[in-house]
Amino acid sequence: MTQQRPPLEIRLCGPRGFCAGVDRAIQIVVLALKKYGAPVYVRHEIVHNRYVVEGLQARGAIFVEELDEIPAAHRNQPVVFSAHGVPKSVPADAEAKNLFYLDATCPLVSKVHKQAMRHQRLGRHVILIGHSGHPEVIGTMGQLPDGAVTLIETVEDAHTCHFDDEDNLGFVTQTTLSVDDTAGIIKELQARFPNLAAPAAESICYATTNRQDAVRAAAPGCDLFLIVGAPNSSNSKRLVEVAEKAGARMSMLVQRAEDIEWEQIGDISVVGLSAGASAPEIIVDEIIDAFKARFDVKIELAETTVETENFLVNREIRDVELTVKDMAFVNGEHRVVGISKLMQGK
């Protein structure tokens, strides 16, 4: 006699997973491999997700941390800069080495770079709200001369920082931060420095905000909230924090279904599920299947908005057709519409 499986409601958040910037970055590597052949070099992880990196490695991408790691014999092969952005010194170094590069920096990160440079042009010292050591922060700070940017990570930092000219300050933020935590830091800075100039547009990206809003709406009443993402993914870790603050009894970050500690979970009847902006939909499917093997699952879509954004790839590779099959290693059978939209605006 087959044992009856306990009932389980999965609140599947929407939006979740890949944002337009991550989609674009992965597509740039895939299209470069199709056009130029392997190897294609990628400086730093193209996005912070092990599954994506390994999938691209299997297709011929080689990941390096510095351009000096590219062998002289392969200097005619393209190198792709990651979605997080790079300091100005990196493309300058590539040009000095006569390397052909494709910049996969997310357009919204590039917007933050421009905001920081605008502050400086107007004579302001730049305050960057972000996490020390994150590639995006390194890239943003590297747009300006040494000493032109001060990094603020916490409300305490905002409370204790000092500047020579407190009347000429401007701030920008890392795109993947918690909206709530950032608001507290900005409030403290504005209280101390009334003339603090804000960026012309919001720095935190739409996808970060949308994913946090969806998790915040779904979390109340959840016994467990799972976020699919990598330990070094800033936006994924923020989603775990949002779920806890919004009322989930327990929340955790997992990279694959095999990471779920079933014994630790205990008795559950409602599970929230979302994915960071660099986590592929195929892993979400994998986790749902793992629950279906143990529970009688009912899926409820917890959708707060629908995203329609798409970013064009670099002009040099727009002549290459991108197919559903090309992206199946991360998308499975999902999100095929974005591929047809990608080639618009050649």
From Swiss-Prot:
It is an enzyme of class 1 (oxidoreductase). GO terms for molecular function: 4 iron, 4 sulfur cluster binding; 4-hydroxy-3-methylbut-2-enyl diphosphate reductase activity; metal ion binding. The keyword Metal-binding applies. Catalyzes the conversion of 1-hydroxy-2-methyl-2-(E)-butenyl 4-diphosphate (HMBPP) into a mixture of isopentenyl diphosphate (IPP) and dimethylallyl diphosphate (DMAPP). Acts in the terminal step of the DOXP/MEP pathway for isoprenoid precursor biosynthesis. Isopentenyl diphosphate binds at residues 48, 84, 134, 233-235, 278. The active site is at 136 (proton donor). Dimethylallyl diphosphate binds at residues 48, 84, 134, 233-235, 278. Pathway: Isoprenoid biosynthesis; dimethylallyl diphosphate biosynthesis; dimethylallyl diphosphate from (2E)-4-hydroxy-3-methylbutenyl diphosphate: step 1/1; Isoprenoid biosynthesis; isopentenyl diphosphate biosynthesis via DXP pathway; isopentenyl diphosphate from 1-deoxy-D-xylulose 5-phosphate: step 6/6. (2E)-4-hydroxy-3-methylbut-2-enyl diphosphate binds at residues 48, 84, 134, 175, 233-235, 278. Binds 1 [4Fe-4S] cluster per subunit. Its cofactor is [4Fe-4S] cluster. It catalyses: isopentenyl diphosphate + 2 oxidized [2Fe-2S]-[ferredoxin] + H2O = (2E)-4-hydroxy-3-methylbut-2-enyl diphosphate + 2 reduced [2Fe-2S]-[ferredoxin] + 2 H(+); dimethylallyl diphosphate + 2 oxidized [2Fe-2S]-[ferredoxin] + H2O = (2E)-4-hydroxy-3-methylbut-2-enyl diphosphate + 2 reduced [2Fe-2S]-[ferredoxin] + 2 H(+). Keywords: 4Fe-4S, Iron, Iron-sulfur, Isoprene biosynthesis, Metal-binding, Oxidoreductase. Its EC number is 1.17.7.4. This is 4-hydroxy-3-methylbut-2-enyl diphosphate reductase. The gene is ispH. [4Fe-4S] cluster binds at residues 19, 106, 205. Belongs to the IspH family. GO terms for biological process: dimethylallyl diphosphate biosynthetic process; isopentenyl diphosphate biosynthetic process, methylerythritol 4-phosphate pathway; terpenoid biosynthetic process. NCBIfam families: ispH_lytB, PRK01045.1-4. InterPro entries: LytB/IspH.
